């Protein structure tokens, strides 16, 4: 097993004394150096000792939740239950990720609530990731370029995967599309060997010429 990247200190959480701060034992990433304090965990089962994943600020990962890969938590974010956070995921603000939610790619910030069997993931075509912010709630599955804002809700059982580079904005009362590239009139290329038909103009005879 690789050398441990963090240890659990004796610094207890002010409200949940069974949670303790972590401390980096080596440089983890550019903004996390050896000796830096991080957020709170319940045990080493909450944060992988491998990769560049990290819990910063006053963020909490507890119960059976697990953070791994390159995921980053900060501010007062809370991950609990059996939730799993990985990949290029960024979780901040007062976000709560719980139950069996899985985030493999996404940016979450604000008073967001992600629970149930929710999933956030990157689209396999564009690599785009969803953004969930402000007071949005997600119970369903989102992939690709989305921005879910304000008090919008993605209901359970809903799966939306955006395979385009356009950003789909979902608010509580509206859906809007932000086009990444200017739309131009399409230019069509003729198939190989195509020859346009020659049109023959027939002169209409005057009635006097028919006599």
Task: Name each model feature, range by range.
Residues 56, 62, 68, 74, ...:
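Feature marks extracellular polysaccharide-active and adherence modules
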């Amino acid at each position: 097993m690789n050398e441990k990247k963090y240890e659990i200190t004796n610094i207890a959480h002010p409200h949940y004394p069974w949670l303790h701060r972590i401390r980096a034992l080596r440089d983890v990433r550019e903004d996390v150096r050896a000796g830096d304090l991080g957020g709170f965990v319940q045990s080493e089962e909450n944060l992988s000792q491998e990769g560049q994943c990290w819990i910063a600020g006053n963020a909490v990962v507890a119960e059976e939740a697990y953070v791994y890969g390159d995921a980053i938590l900060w501010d007062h974010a809370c991950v609990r239950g059996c939730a799993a956070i990985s990949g290029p995921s960024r979780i901040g603000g007062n976000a709560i990720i719980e139950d069996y939610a899985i985030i493999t790619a996404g940016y979450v910030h604000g008073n967001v609530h992600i629970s149930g069997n929710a999933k956030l993931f990157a689209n396999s075509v564009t690599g785009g990731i969803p953004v969930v912010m402000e007071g949005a709630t997600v119970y369903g599955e989102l992939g690709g370029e989305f921005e879910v804002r304000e008090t919008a809700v993605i209901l359970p059982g809903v799966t939306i995967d955006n395979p385009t580079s356009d950003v789909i904005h979902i608010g509580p009362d509206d859906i809007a599309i932000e086009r990444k590239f200017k739309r131009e009139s399409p230019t069509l290329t003729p198939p190989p060997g195509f020859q346009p038909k020659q049109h023959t103009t027939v002169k209409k005879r005057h009635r006097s010429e028919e006599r």
